[in-house]
């Protein structure tokens, strides 16, 4: 069952019913609670652009509980976060892995957070290839470039040497919230709003 909860709010004109995500959007909160695919990316990008149009000065809050997903979909979100004027605060609630972790560490500096029992995981991009040898070679080169670019981004955002990042992302590298803070992925571990 995938029922979306509704909340009822009292207004001057009576009661108003919202699905919970629309109500959170009123408070400038966007939630990524699934694998990152094109549909999720389109929804998050639309919400980011809408909130910027509503008020370009107020921060936006991106709550992340995601195993990652498509790099192209993830970059659509990340590039939009960088494009818009408002700062995007990020918060890991549960799990931020792969591109979920990249979105987490791409929040505004000083505004990247994790809840105490969160887990963060970074690794190299995954991919596969089939076809003729030339096609496989093209795909391999693309994945290696993507790996380098992602490692460079992690190093820049965390302050870690690229050599350490390259070593750590050779495999799934899991961190607790406190370890992610020490690594530079988040700025603080929060227990209260």
From Swiss-Prot:
Q: Which domain of life is it from?
A: Bacteria
- Cite the entry's keywords alphabetically: Cytoplasm, Hydrolase, Protease, Serine protease
| UniProt GO MF annotations | ATP-dependent peptidase activity; ATPase binding; serine-type endopeptidase activity
Q: Which reaction does it catalyse?
A: Hydrolysis of proteins to small peptides in the presence of ATP and magnesium. alpha-casein is the usual test substrate. In the absence of ATP, only oligopeptides shorter than five residues are hydrolyzed (such as succinyl-Leu-Tyr-|-NHMec, and Leu-Tyr-Leu-|-Tyr-Trp, in which cleavage of the -Tyr-|-Leu- and -Tyr-|-Trp bonds also occurs)
Active-site residues, as the UniProt record annotates them:
98, 123
* Record-level GO cellular component terms: cytoplasm; endopeptidase Clp complex
Q: What is its main location?
A: cytoplasm
BP term (GO), one: protein quality control for misfolded or incompletely synthesized proteins
Give the record's subunit note. Fourteen ClpP subunits assemble into 2 heptameric rings which stack back to back to give a disk-like structure with a central cavity, resembling the structure of eukaryotic proteasomes.
Q: What does this protein do?
A: Cleaves peptides in various proteins in a process that requires ATP hydrolysis. Has a chymotrypsin-like activity. Plays a major role in the degradation of misfolded proteins.
Q: What is this protein called?
A: ATP-dependent Clp protease proteolytic subunit 1
> Source species, please?
Bacillus cereus (strain ZK / E33L)
């Amino acid at each position: 069952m995938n029922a979306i909860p509704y909340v009822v709010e009292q207004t001057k004109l009576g009661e108003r019913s919202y699905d919970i995500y629309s109500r959170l959007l009123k408070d400038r909160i966007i939630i990524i609670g699934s694998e990152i695919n094109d549909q999720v990316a389109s929804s998050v990008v639309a919400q980011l652009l809408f909130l910027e149009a509503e008020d370009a000065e107020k921060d936006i809050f991106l709550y992340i509980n995601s195993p990652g997903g498509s790099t192209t979909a993830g970059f659509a979100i990340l590039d939009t976060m960088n494009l818009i004027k408002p700062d995007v605060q990020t918060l890991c609630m549960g799990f931020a892995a792969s591109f979920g972790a990249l979105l987490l560490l791409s929040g505004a500096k000083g505004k990247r957070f994790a809840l105490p029992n969160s887990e963060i995981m970074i690794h190299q991009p995954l991919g596969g290839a089939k076809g003729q040898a030339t096609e496989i070679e093209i795909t391999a080169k693309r994945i290696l470039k993507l790996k380098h670019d992602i490692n460079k981004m992690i190093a820049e955002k965390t302050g870690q040497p690229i050599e350490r990042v390259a070593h750590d992302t050779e495999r799934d590298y899991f961190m607790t919230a406190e370890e992610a803070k020490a690594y530079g992925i988040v700025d603080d571990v929060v227990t209260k709003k």
